[in-house]
Amino acid sequence: FNPKEISINTKVIPMDVLLRRLKQGTLILNPDFQRNEVWTDVRKSQLIESILLEIPLPMFYVSADEEGRWTVVDGLQRISAFRDFILGATYMKSKRSEDEGLGIKLKGLEFLKNIEGLQMKKLPNNLSNRIMEAQFSLTVINPGTPDEVKRNIFKRINTGGVPLSSQEIRNALYGGKISSLLKRMSEMKSF
């Protein structure tokens, strides 16, 4: 690729922007080079606890397309944790506002044991506000940047958290239509 074709910028966004995009479907969590969601509810809860303790989180990386959609390049596990706690699976299916906030219950917390077992909707206002007002650093890979750059960024920064398997690294490096087909096939019951 031509390095002059790379167009990247960084911004700070609040939690409500991530949530709005999740609700709209303009934040894509499962590109062909990303692995599946692998975090347990305990790990997701500990991420929420980190926000409540105001511990800075690593940067998120997204790739923007011409229609304004963002595809997650790095940060799938973290954004999925936000979705599963703040919005919840029931809301994501029903899209009914009364179902929002009934996601996973916090568990396995290290410091804030007094809120174990609570869902977003049951948190005291000061804590739910802290979550909703959290801000994140986001790197946007702008439209026109070659796909190879997206895969390379994923490979370079994905060194923390749950280690990638050899197959996940191969998908990141050599992905494309065949990886997408293989991923769909692996999810079939006949496999």
Regions found by a protein language model. Give the residues of each.
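Short connector loops/turns at beta-strand edges and beta->alpha or beta->beta junctions
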Residues: 23-24, 56
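Basic- and aromatic-enriched surface patches that contact anionic nucleotides/nucleic acids
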Residues: 1-17, 31-191
